[in-house]
Amino acid sequence: MRAASTNKALLAAAASLAPAGMIIDPFDRLAEVPPFNPDHETPTPPAIVALWRGEIGISDGLLISTPEYARGVPGSLKNALDWLVSSEVFPGKPVALFQASERGGAVQAALRLILETMSAKLVEPAMLTLPLLGTQTDAVAIAANPAHSNKIREALEAYARFLA
């Protein structure tokens, strides 16, 4: 994820606003996940894939915040999701999608299709789109803006209720 990513800032703001007991721990190593290859689907996958699957396995849910590239899902995210397809840790996993731009409709639609195919539980009340593109890209500023922080809290509280 880019250092100045608005989606990264949104996740950091969400982490600071999360309800008691909710920990948001971004996985920032997607770029290290090798290209998916079914031939490498063995009991001992590459170490970073094992780490990724392990993090997903111990989590109660998955919160995805991603940009839209060429009207779709960024390759690194799609690749990481591909590594979860045959894994027992993902089916039924509750997923919320956060979007830092109102222009992210295509990535949302593509992600929904992918995640539904993977048997995720999409948590509709926890879905969030904020018009952050071209505004505050700093997590502190996002969290300090009542219009944004209230919406983030509402989405996270809905997610927490679903996970409870």
Q: Model segments located where?
A:
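Glycine-rich phosphate/pyrophosphate-binding loop and the adjoining helix
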Residues: K121-A164
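N-terminal beta-loop-helix "entrance" segment that forms/cooperates
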Residues: R29-P45, T137-V140
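Active-site-adjacent alpha-helix of alpha/beta-hydrolase-fold enzymes
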Residues: A13-A20, I114-L122
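Short beta-strand elements in bilobed, periplasmic/extracellular small-molecule ligand-binding domains
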Residues: M22-A31, P35, L122-P131
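N-terminal beta1-alpha1 ligand-phosphate binding loop
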Residues: M1-M22
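Helix-loop-strand module that forms the ligand-binding subsite of alpha/beta enzymes
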Residues: T44-S119
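A general structural signal for well-ordered alpha-helical segments in protein cores
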Residues: N7, L11, V49, L77, ...
